[in-house]
Curated annotation (Swiss-Prot):
Subunit structure, interactors included: Interacts with FGFBP1. Interacts with FGFR2. Affinity between fibroblast growth factors (FGFs) and their receptors is increased by heparan sulfate glycosaminoglycans that function as coreceptors.
Glycosylation sites: N45
Species of origin: Ovis aries (Sheep)
Residue spans crossing the bilayer: none
Name listed for the protein in its UniProt record: Fibroblast growth factor 7
Record Pfam families: FGF (PF00167)
Gene that produces this protein: FGF7
Entry keyword set: Glycoprotein, Growth factor, Heparin-binding, Mitogen, Signal
Keyword Signal: yes
Length: 194
C-alpha cells in the first residue's frame, strides 16, 4: 500500500516543481520585457531575437522610401509646387507622393517628390516647406502598436513635450504645440505607391 502512495506522490511532486520552474521563467521574461532598451543591452540574459522583431532595416540609415502619408483623419499629406503644406483627399495627386529618407536611426527627412520641397517644422510648431534640408526637416519616426506612424520634430519641443506632424479633420496642418502622440490627427500610414 505504501508503494502505491509513493508512486502517485512522485509524479505530483514533479508536476509541482515543473510548474514552479515555468512560473519562475515567466516572471523573469516579464521582468525583461519591462526594461528600457539601455537596460536590455546590458542584460545578456534578456536579449533575444524575438525582442527585436520591430527593428526595421530602413531605420538604420541611408534608406529611401517613396510613400503617400495617409492621416487617420482621411487626408493625404501634400506639399504643393509653391511649398504649401496641407492635406488632400485625392489619392492620385502627385504632390502627395513623399520621399522618406532615413537620416539616422529613427530620424527621417520627408520630401515632396513632385514639388522638391522638404517638410519642416519651426520652433512654434508650424509646418512649412523648405527647398534645402536642415535640422528643421528632421523628424523622429515612431511606429505605434496600431500600425500607424508618428513624426515628431527631432529639433523642437514645447514645454518638454514632442511636437508632431498632424492634419485636422479639414486637412489643415495642426500646430505641433497642440499635438500629442495619442491623437489621431498625428497618426499616418505610409502607403506604397501603386
Amino acid at each position: 500500500m505504501r508503494k502505491w502512495i509513493l508512486t502517485w506522490i512522485l509524479p505530483s511532486l514533479l508536476y509541482r516543481s515543473c510548474f514552479h520552474i515555468i512560473c519562475l521563467v515567466g516572471t523573469i521574461s516579464l521582468a525583461c520585457n519591462d526594461m528600457t532598451p539601455e537596460q536590455m543591452a546590458t542584460n545578456v540574459n534578456c536579449s533575444s531575437p524575438e525582442r527585436h522583431t520591430r527593428s526595421y532595416d530602413y531605420m538604420e540609415g541611408g534608406d529611401i522610401r517613396v510613400r503617400r502619408l495617409f492621416c487617420r483623419t482621411q487626408w493625404y499629406l501634400r506639399i504643393d509646387k509653391r511649398g504649401k503644406v496641407k492635406g488632400t483627399q485625392e489619392m492620385k495627386n502627385n504632390y502627395n507622393i513623399m520621399e522618406i529618407r532615413t537620416v539616422a536611426v529613427g530620424i527621417v527627412a520627408i520630401k515632396g517628390v513632385e514639388s522638391e520641397y522638404y517638410l519642416a517644422m519651426n520652433k512654434e510648431g508650424k509646418l512649412y516647406a523648405k527647398k534645402e534640408c536642415n535640422e528643421d526637416c528632421n523628424f523622429k519616426e515612431l511606429i505605434l502598436e496600431n500600425h500607424y506612424n508618428t513624426y515628431a520634430s527631432a529639433k523642437w519641443t514645447h514645454s518638454g513635450g514632442e511636437m508632431f506632424v498632424a492634419l485636422n479633420s479639414k486637412g489643415v496642418p495642426v500646430r505641433g504645440k497642440k499635438t500629442k502622440k495619442e491623437q489621431k490627427t498625428a497618426h499616418f500610414l505610409p502607403m506604397a505607391i501603386t
